Amino acid sequence: MARACDLDSRNVNYGVTDEFQSAKGEMQLYALIESGQTERIRVLSPQCRVTSRRDVIDLGLVEVDESLAWLKDHVATREAFSSDALAAVAVHKGSAALSFLIDMADAGPTTELRKSAIFWMSQARITESAGELERLMFRDGSSEIRRHAAFSLSQSTAANRSDALIRQGREDGDPEVRAQAWFWLAQTGASASEEAIQWAVANDPDDDVRKEAVFAMSQLPEERGVEALFAVLGNQRMPRDVREQALFWLAQSDSDRAFQYLDRLLAGAL
């Protein structure tokens, strides 16, 4: 049975990437218009059964160009729901929608609008926009945009996401950008994560980045995080503060092996 989408709830959303990918040529676009003013925009999967206390007027199928033109006006004039409008733009087929997203990501009038465009490119148009996201990760002058592009790529299905995050973690000139790259790499669970993050712990010139890289290890899936933290603790060449950080995050783990290690440490057996 299809799940229900309540248009009266402000929390109802377009869902996740899978919903976009499952759409077969059509999406449901809803707008709440009161006294001639658009108050809300929602784009929903065709599989979502819509409910509302208000009367819903069905306009039928709308041509792509007409729909895009209406949405573009709302991106430009109503920042309150520009992200919702950009999400709706993202699910439109064709080059015009993608070009608009790229333009907003590259040179939107506000940082928040740029970030929204970047996110929806990653969620709904990743096959076509992976290269653009990488360009923003490595060439944009704003560290906030580079961080957000990395986050967005990490939340996508892009095949190259782990390679791009590793490169950013090694090469970006901003310590905060490098630190966040390691965190998002760990969240992807990519097989190359441990080796790459261990490199950062051992080699990054910034103390805070090294500490954040240790934290990133704790975010690796299941026992992989515990193993990575054990490796730091067992490396006598690591600075004391880094090993202490590894011990701290190990203590936050629910792993039985971590508890056993801590018991032996407290008993003086290590």
Please place each PLM-identified region on the residue numbering:
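N-terminal accessory interaction module
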Residues: 1-73
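Non-membrane alpha-helical segments in proteins
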Residues: 43-44, 52, 80-91, 115-120
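Amphipathic alpha-helical scaffolding segments comprising HEAT/armadillo-like alpha-solenoid repeats
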Residues: 62-75, 94-106, 126-138, 158-170, ...
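Alpha-helix N-cap/helix-start positions at coil->helix boundaries
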Residues: 79-80, 95, 110-112, 142-144, ...
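Alpha-solenoid HEAT/ARM repeat scaffold
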Residues: 83, 115-116, 147-148, 179-180, ...
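Residue-level signature of alpha-solenoid helical repeat scaffolds
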Residues: 87, 119, 151, 183, ...
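Alpha-helical adaptor scaffolds
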Residues: 148, 179-187, 193, 197-202, ...
